[in-house]
Amino acid sequence: MNPNYLDFEQPIADLEAKIQELRNASAGPAVNVEAEVHALQDKLRLRTAQIFRNLTSWQVLQLARHPSRPYTADYLRVMFDEFQELAGDRAFADDKAIMGGLARINGRSVMVIGHQKGRDTKEKIKRNFGMPKPEGYRKALRLMKMAERFGLPVLTLIDTAGAWPGIDAESRGQSEAIARNLIEMAELKVPIICTVIGEGGSGGALALGVGDRTVMLEYAVYSTITPEGCASILWKDAGKAKDAAEQLGLTAPRLKSLGLVDKVVREPTGGAHRNPTQMAKRLKAVLLNELDALEKLSTEQLLEQRYTRLRSYGTYEAA
């Protein structure tokens, strides 16, 4: 099986392989297979739509974790006219699991901050698999405070399995760094738009996730814990991760129905990794629309709406 395909995509992989075989055969003399190719392409479109219309939460998670899925750096290249990365927390070190800096989007100056996982082994180690340490969150906060001083909107791109749980991170105040970001982001006097582009894992995601708008890509996930971790705690069996994924309600449509997400951005057929440029353009359009709306508000209106939004989380009506 092609490594770019997930297990539930095997029927799609088989059809695409048949189409390629026919195209290769048509290169020979007096061979015309266009009718067959068109028929298979129609079948491929229908089969793909059928599969992606009925995805389980576990399958959505596999898409969110796909190794070819666009990361923060990929969106920076396509969505922004300019980007100047800024490094370091001015206290301990520069955590490469968080990247951020000044950028322009359609000529508008913003501060962009996001998790970065890494593609190959070397980069994954450099980026710590996209799992930040305290210095990463403190770097993010430093950039947010800089944005506030200069009146720049903040855009965050969330994609992490969670904050780094190592002893080194704990000894430098991991929980305090995350909590500090939650407090400061709630009070930041500039617009904040948070977008979950892949995995939104626990406090490690939430430390970049407090804002005026929360956007999720169609096949992104957002939860308090990974399904594997949840299954290990609840049932003492990580093998029940598929069941945990269903119970966690981690998909974008489910979270939107609960009022935790404001907008879900549709992904290209097959997921963002099938057409990263198209995905970036769709997300860019959404972010520009949201920025237009938020920048019409006064600082007082912005903060009041943000507080109201945050206080609404978890409310329910008793039967």
Swiss-Prot record:
Q: Where in the cell is it found?
A: Cytoplasm
- Molecular function (Gene Ontology), one example: acetyl-CoA carboxylase activity
The domain of life for this entry's organism is Bacteria
Recite the UniProt keywords alphabetically.
ATP-binding, Cytoplasm, Fatty acid biosynthesis, Fatty acid metabolism, Lipid biosynthesis, Lipid metabolism, Nucleotide-binding, Transferase
Q: Give the PROSITE patterns listed for this entry.
A: COA_CT_CTER (PS50989)
Which enzyme class? transferase
Domain CoA carboxyltransferase C-terminal: from-to ranges = 38-293
A Gene Ontology cellular component where this protein is annotated is: acetyl-CoA carboxylase complex
Q: Name one GO biological process term.
A: malonyl-CoA biosynthetic process
The principal location of this protein is cytoplasm
- Functional summary from the UniProt entry: Component of the acetyl coenzyme A carboxylase (ACC) complex. First, biotin carboxylase catalyzes the carboxylation of biotin on its carrier protein (BCCP) and then the CO(2) group is transferred by the carboxyltransferase to acetyl-CoA to form malonyl-CoA.
Protein name (record): Acetyl-coenzyme A carboxylase carboxyl transferase subunit alpha
Tell me which species this is from.
Answer: Stenotrophomonas maltophilia (strain R551-3)
Question: Highest lineage ranks of the organism?
Answer: Bacteria, Pseudomonadati, Pseudomonadota, Gammaproteobacteria, Lysobacterales
